[in-house]
Amino acid sequence: MTQTHSTELFKPNRAFAKTARIKNLCEYEDLRLDAEEDFEGFWGKLAKEKIDWMEPFSKVLDESEAPFYKWFVGGKLNVCAQCLDRHLDTRKNKAAIIFEGELGDSRIITYRELFYEVKRTANLLKNKFNVKKGDRVVIYMPMIPEAAFMMLACARIGAIHSVVFGGFSAEALRDRIIDAEAKLVITADGAYRRGKPYMLKPVVDDALAEGACPSIEKVLIVIRNKEEINYVPGRDYIYNEMIGLESAHCPPEPMDAEDPLFLLYTSGSTGKPKGVQHNQAGYILWAQTTMEWVFDVKENDTYWCTADVGWITGHTYIVYGPLAMGATTVMYEGVPIYPDTGRWWKMIEHYRVNQFYTAPTAIRLLHKEGKEEPKKYNLSNLKVLGTVGEPINPDAWNWYYNEIGGGQCPIVDTWWQTETGGHMISPLPGATPIKPGCATLPLPGIFAEVIDEEGNPKPAGEQGYLCITKPWPSMIRNIWGDPKRYESSYFSTCKKNGKPVYFAGDGAIRDERGYITITGRMDDVINVSGHRLGTAEIESAIAKHPGVAETAVVSRLDEIKGESVYAFIVLKPGYEDNVAEELQLLKEINAVITREIGPLAKADTMLFVPGLPKTRSGKIMRRILRSIARGEEITQDTSTLEDPAIVQKIQQLA
């Protein structure tokens, strides 16, 4: 899939713009200049307006230990109270969460009901599982409301939650439990996917087998699909049997603005996943502010983000952001094509969804598999469409804009990351003329620049490093337990005025208007269906197969997923030159990847090769392999390779 970008601009819908929070580019420019002229004043004003402080902050920003920035120093708050307690006077009977299961079961949970459910859950964690402020709790759950209950309950009592995507393997789950030194695992028996039950509890059992996670004291299980599970007496407890016995009185714990709120593990360019640490005040401020600015959600709107709570998009734009601003957020358990490709459009019609936020992968899939399906449904309540996780190609953009949005809904093509906490570059739906496939302009207060390593701006049309040159409140605070890796991962590539700045890992191009187009990763991370996978992590998994001598993994462009995994594999003696065995090897190696990481990381293509292109110092030249995988001309200098002839040999096999 080649990424070509239109130069045509789509102006905001005038009727929409009249009632938008930011109505035109002049208002955007005023906010941008406010941040430029009085940086701390800009953020301090937002924090005072939007957060219900238990104690006021004394200092907006402390840069004394940069890049370990501290925001809203001295302030105290509770994120759960920000999401629930403060809405009870005016919104107690408003729907907070609308849940639909894949089999069609549904629940509407009001703010009052959610408030009481979360307080009971918080008491259960405190009283029965001895979870205290600062303890880590791993949540390995499907897309059901109880996942949100658990996150908010942790926030209420000051525990640090770490949600692990339910598609990850036992090994991946174990690694995250060990790194976080978690006290408790919360899971479900299972859930439903593609109309069938799938299991989560056995994965937890495997992760904890043979005392592999000594920090874990107990396992709390939510019963969802009622399939038979293994029950370990003294360790395993059923949430559904215990929650009704708990009191609904649980005052929120006052938390320092810089206390950790959650950890979320993300792939890095080295093998070990990074525990991205987000803290209290800055995170919730930007989650709420971007909900208001980017989606322009109004009091009576229904908002739906199709992500999973196991990813940052689910944290910020299913749970924390919508609830902090008092919105109605939709949660859906299953896949977009069950029982057919009209499932999402049927839900948009039924729940009268006004803002819809999804990944380009899903749009491409539905465009390919059910192009005419949207015509069967009334989608006229939609006001804003959004995309997240990867760049969107113009064909998919045009179908989304015309067929789903009826040519009336602005598309907010949002660029941000696990590490940024919330949107960084995005159109504002009432203000920004939209360019298909382009993230457009940095949000007010965000100083995103396309520069070289020394901080010099790249000329218009020329690719450079996408860097954020000033701190922002929702930024990553640390990599859990590894401050050196935090500095080396994010602040060692680029400088501005001699000072290290945050490098996002992405390349970008800025045009004459100042619009920013993301060109893709500049490090060894693959973006599959909007999910980041580290090449080193996949390579480590493949290397565990006894027949593999050496491997290198790169990305290949994919029409549906954006990128797919392409593995070049050197086999050990005795495994080569046997076609029948090679087919079996392909299955076995993907089984290893699934076991070690999860099915998302499986290689779509494997090529058995006699060797890999290496420099004389032993470094594998992945850019050459990426060019081969994508069928591109090799422009890199191969004369410095240890064996220049290996490139031609690999090309012939590919």
Swiss-Prot record:
Binding site for ATP: 389-391, 413-418, 506, 521, 532
Pfam families: ACAS_N, AMP-binding, AMP-binding_C
Highest taxon, organism lineage: Bacteria
UniProt keywords, alphabetically: Acetylation, ATP-binding, Ligase, Magnesium, Metal-binding, Nucleotide-binding
Keyword match Acetylation: yes
Annotated positions binding CoA: 193-196, 313, 529
Residues modified as N6-acetyllysine: 619
Entry's Gene Ontology molecular function annotations: acetate-CoA ligase activity; AMP binding; ATP binding; metal ion binding
Post-translational modification: Acetylated. Deacetylation by the SIR2-homolog deacetylase activates the enzyme.
Positions contributing to Mg(2+) binding: 545, 548
Cofactor(s) named in the record: Mg(2+)
Keyword Acetylation annotated: yes
PROSITE patterns, per database record: AMP_BINDING
Catalytic activity: acetate + ATP + CoA = acetyl-CoA + AMP + diphosphate
Signal sequence segment: none
EC number: 6.2.1.1
GO biological process entries: acetyl-CoA biosynthetic process from acetate
One Gene Ontology cellular component annotation held by this UniProt entry: cytosol
The family this protein is said to belong to: Belongs to the ATP-dependent AMP-binding enzyme family.
Functional summary from the UniProt entry: Catalyzes the conversion of acetate into acetyl-CoA (AcCoA), an essential intermediate at the junction of anabolic and catabolic pathways. AcsA undergoes a two-step reaction. In the first half reaction, AcsA combines acetate with ATP to form acetyl-adenylate (AcAMP) intermediate. In the second half reaction, it can then transfer the acetyl group from AcAMP to the sulfhydryl group of CoA, forming the product AcCoA.
NCBIfam families referenced in this protein's UniProt entry, alphabetically: Ac_CoA_lig_AcsA (TIGR02188), PRK00174.1 (NF001208)
Protein name: Acetyl-coenzyme A synthetase
Protein's organism: Wolinella succinogenes (strain ATCC 29543 / DSM 1740 / CCUG 13145 / JCM 31913 / LMG 7466 / NCTC 11488 / FDC 602W)
